[in-house]
Each structure stands twice: as C-alpha cells, then as structure tokens.
Amino acid sequence: MDEKGRSLKNNNMEDEMDLKRGPWTAEEDFKLMNYIATNGEGRWNSLSRCAGLQRTGKSCRLRWLNYLRPDVRRGNITLEEQLLILELHSRWGNRWSKIAQYLPGRTDNEIKNYWRTRVQKHAKQLKCDVNSQQFKDTMKYLWMPRLVERIQSASASSAAAATTTTTTTTGSAGTSSCITTSNNQFMNYDYNNNNMGQQFGVMSNNDYITPENSSVAVSPASDLTEYYSAPNPNPEYYSGQMGNSYYPDQNLVSSQLLPDNYFDYSGLLDEDLTAMQEQSNLSWFENINGAASSSDSLWNIGETDEEFWFLQQQQQFNNNGSF
C-alpha cells in the first residue's frame, strides 16, 4: 500500500511539474476554442488533457469564460452598467455570478474588479466602511441619482449632435448652391462691363482675371490694390506674380470721381498692411484663446473627482444630522 501510494504521489508531482504557468499563448487559445467548438464546455480537467493543453482545468475554465467566449464584452463599464451593478449589489451583496447574469457579456470577475477598484475606493476616501448603512444611503440617495442624471445628459448630447450633423449637411448643400450663383453673377457683371466699355470707347482687356482663370488666390488686399490702383512699390514682384492681368491707368482715374471718405492707400506699403493684419489677428486669437483657457480650467474636472466631491458633500450632510 505504501509503495502504491508513493507511486500515485510521484505521478501527481510529475503532472504538476509538466503544467504550464503564466500567460496563455495564441496557440493554446486556438486549441481551447477549437475543442470547445467541437465538444462543448464542461469537465474542464478532462478537457484540458483531451485538448492537448498543459493547463489545469480551472485555468482552462477561467480563460474561456473571461476572455475567449464569443459574447464577452470589452471596454469600460458603461454608466448604465454601473447603475445596474449598484442596484443589484444593494439586493444580493457580493454574489458576483448572479449579478453577471443581468449584464450580458460581462463576467463575474470583471464586475468584482469594478466594485473593488471604484466603489470601495470611494468608501475609503470618505473614511467609512463600504458595508455601512451610511455608505449604502450615500449610494442610494446620491450616487445612483447622479448616474441617472449623467445618463440622461449623455443621451441628450447624442441627440443634439445628430441634429447638428443633419443641419450641417443641409447647410453645406445650400452653401454650394450660393457659391455657384455668385460665380454666375460675377461672370454676368464682367460681361456687361466689357459691353459698356465698347459702347463708350473705353479700352477693355480680354485677359481680365477671374476666379476661373487666375492662379493667384483672391484676398482683400489684392481687391483694394486692383480697384484703387495703389502705386506699385516693387514693379518686378507684381509683374512676375500677376502676369497679363489688367490694371487701369492711374491717370484715367480723376480725383473728382473718388468718394469723400476715400482713404489714400498710396502711403501704405504691403509691409504696413501685413503688419496691421497680423496685429489684428493676434489680438483676436489672444482674446479667444484666453476665454477658452478660462473655460477649460473651470470645467476640467475628472469623473472620479466629481463623484468623490458629491459623495463627500453627502457625508458632511449626514454628519450634521440633517439626512
């Protein structure tokens, strides 16, 4: 009997020495999934040997239930799931497997980890026991209603974002229509001006620049230069950039035809105009950036900090005996 017992003990020790520990490999995952797809779940100790895995039955079961099962959900626990966990835990306590039945795709181990890392952490920060009546009341009357508010707010934000997307799409189509109409009006205006010039004997140029045949982007400064015929401080630069573009002769423009509030741009070089524009843009950007920074600092509160603040306020309220 002693020899037989020793042989069985030695065999068990040899089996334990052959077992693998540590992370699973992709090859092991494939073997486990392939075997379960063919033979089903259950009898995990025999399943491990039949599948050719040097793992314990418990290791195979946990690997399948927590990671390889097709319906296992990934990612953070949602607000709705958090609310359901708090509600079910208030009824059944630490019965994680039973709670997991009401959260499809979530494992009992994942729910237990959420409870220990989030709920117990808040209780510790509030310096009270997680199983105390005070903390249970805090969850029931403050934390859970707060979750409901956040769920409703997130739903409203999603609906508003969907409405904004629809409006933006419609507005883009309208903008394209307006641009097309504007281009047509511009062409008609240019055609009428050429006809009027022919009637009154004024020279016209068929190479007049339009948005269609120009290779230079249109800007407000170029418009002012074209219509008011400012003196050219650098003739070589403008002649190289504008090519065959037409500029009216300055001698043909009489000072009597200019309006009284006409500003003489001849005294401003391109450097002055550029400096004025950059200063204006810089002031505008600083104002906007300053407002955004103050707003961000005001609302930059983490989710955990916000929840902890509410729970702390509730605890102070309870300590004063007004709860």
UniProtKB/Swiss-Prot annotation:
Alphabetical keyword list: Activator, DNA-binding, Nucleus, Plant defense, Repeat, Transcription, Transcription regulation, Ubl conjugation
Tissue: Expressed specifically in flowers. Restricted to anthers in maturing flowers. Strongest expression in the vascular and connective tissue where the anther attaches to the filament. Not detected in pollen.
GO cellular component: nucleus
Domain of life: Eukaryota
Record domain HTH myb-type: where: 16-68, 69-123
Native organism: Arabidopsis thaliana
Record PTM: Ubiquitinated in vitro by BOI.
Ranges annotated as DNA-binding: 44-68, 96-119
Gene Ontology molecular-function annotations: DNA-binding transcription factor activity; transcription cis-regulatory region binding
Presence of keyword Ubl conjugation: yes
UniProt-recorded name of the protein: Transcription factor MYB108
Record carries keyword DNA-binding: yes
Knocked-out gene: effects: Reduced male fertility associated with delayed anther dehiscence, reduced pollen viability and decreased fecundity. Increased susceptibility to Botrytis infection. Myb24 and myb108 double mutant has a reduced fertility and a greatly reduced seed set relative to the myb108 parental allele.
Cell compartments where the protein resides: Nucleus
Main location: nucleus
Quaternary structure, from the entry: Interacts with BOI, but not with BRG1.
